[in-house]
């Protein structure tokens, strides 16, 4: 724990928003020499497997961000026949039941559904006995987010906040981390009731975006987007892309009807996961 504190302490002191803005600027630079340098060194440092990428040649990307949110070859992530599939590549931070409206962040640390979603008590009450899974995407992972189940898009809330790192050491130290960081809460209806996918920002995450909105503009104010009448077809099918991170972060998946979700028994905190693999069955 002492090492975790030492790693985390500087984050309280550095200008996280300024550093993130600067990183975002360089990630969008289209100068061939600079962007190729950034991409080449990132691949080397994190051992990125470019054979899975739809565009394998690193020099073919216009900028670092285009490389970072690269598409994969469909055959590299076949979709299982499971009722609920994993929406990302990454690892499980925590998974389990929402207890009296509280989600486990790390050992001994909790935060509430209401804090995470920045919503009223009536909405939070729907998830008070639900199920949740927190999925961490490391820098080397594929950074597009897909649908775990067929769902109807209802609304979206942009919630401004801090930009702490979401690496495991930070989650063990910073209280209510996921309810403090900038995030995007996306609300859906499914055949088993309400579902929310929360895309959590972090230090040097240049942008969070969705397939229907594009990059969500960073703001100091909470913003709500109502899609109840905006789209003629709001159903997004299982496995379809729904969003992306321009640099890595975390997805928190919540189901309101906890009695209907039975997580795969092999999924524990620390487990590696991959897009399309079985995640849960509906009982």
UniProtKB/Swiss-Prot annotation:
Source organism, top-level taxon: Bacteria
EC supergroup of this enzyme: lyase
Pfam families: PS_Dcarbxylase
Keyword Phosphoprotein annotated: no
Metabolic or biological pathway, per its Swiss-Prot or TrEMBL entry: Phospholipid metabolism; phosphatidylethanolamine biosynthesis; phosphatidylethanolamine from CDP-diacylglycerol: step 2/2
InterPro entries for this protein: PS_Dcarbxylase (IPR003817), PSD-B (IPR033177), PSD_type1_pro (IPR033178)
GO cellular component: plasma membrane
This protein's record includes keyword Lyase: yes
Catalytic activity: a 1,2-diacyl-sn-glycero-3-phospho-L-serine + H(+) = a 1,2-diacyl-sn-glycero-3-phosphoethanolamine + CO2
EC number annotated for this UniProt entry: 4.1.1.65
Gene Ontology biological-process entries: phosphatidylethanolamine biosynthetic process
Cofactor section: pyruvate
Active site annotation, chain numbering: 89, 146, 249
Modification sites for Pyruvic acid (Ser): 249
Site (Cleavage (non-hydrolytic)) residue list: 248-249
Membrane topology: Peripheral membrane protein
Molecular function in Gene Ontology: phosphatidylserine decarboxylase activity
Localization annotation: Cell membrane
Keywords (A to Z) from UniProt: Cell membrane, Decarboxylase, Lipid biosynthesis, Lipid metabolism, Lyase, Membrane, Phospholipid biosynthesis, Phospholipid metabolism, Pyruvate, Zymogen
Family under the similarity heading: Belongs to the phosphatidylserine decarboxylase family. PSD-B subfamily. Prokaryotic type I sub-subfamily.
HAMAP family in alphabetical order: PS_decarb_PSD_B_type1 (MF_00662)
Quaternary organization: Heterodimer of a large membrane-associated beta subunit and a small pyruvoyl-containing alpha subunit.
Function statement: Catalyzes the formation of phosphatidylethanolamine (PtdEtn) from phosphatidylserine (PtdSer).
Protein name, per record: Phosphatidylserine decarboxylase proenzyme
Species per Swiss-Prot/TrEMBL record: Legionella pneumophila (strain Paris)
């Amino acid at each position: 724990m002492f090492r975790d504190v030492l790693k985390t302490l500087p984050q309280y002191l550095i200008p996280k928003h300024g550093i993130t803005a600067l990183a975002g600027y360089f990630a969008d630079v289209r100068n061939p020499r600079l962007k190729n340098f950034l991409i080449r060194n990132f691949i080397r440092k994190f051992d990125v497997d470019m054979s899975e990428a739809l565009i394998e040649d690193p020099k073919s990307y216009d900028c670092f961000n285009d490389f970072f949110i690269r598409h994969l070859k469909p055959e590299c992530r076949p979709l299982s026949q499971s009722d609920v599939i994993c929406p990302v590549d990454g690892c499980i931070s925590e998974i389990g039941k929402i207890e009296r409206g509280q989600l486990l962040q790390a050992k001994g640390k909790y935060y509430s559904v209401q804090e995470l979603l920045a919503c009223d008590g009536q909405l939070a009450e729907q998830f008070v006995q639900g199920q949740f899974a927190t999925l961490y995407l490391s820098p080397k992972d594929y950074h597009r987010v897909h649908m775990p189940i067929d769902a109807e898009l209802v609304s979206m809330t942009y919630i401004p906040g801090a930009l702490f790192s979401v690496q495991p050491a930070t989650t063990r130290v910073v209280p209510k981390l996921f309810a403090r960081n900038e995030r995007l809460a996306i609300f859906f209806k499914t055949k088993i009731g309400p579902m929310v996918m929360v895309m959590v920002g972090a230090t040097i995450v240049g942008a969070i975006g969705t397939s229907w909105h594009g990059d969500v503009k960073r703001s100091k104010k909470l913003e709500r987007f109502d899609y109840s009448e905006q789209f003629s077809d709001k159903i997004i099918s299982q496995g379809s892309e729904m969003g992306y991170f321009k640099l890595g972060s975390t997805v928190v998946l919540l189901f309101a009807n906890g009695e209907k979700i039975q997580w795969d028994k092999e999924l524990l905190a620390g487990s590696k996961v991959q897009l399309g693999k079985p995640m849960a069955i509906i009982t």
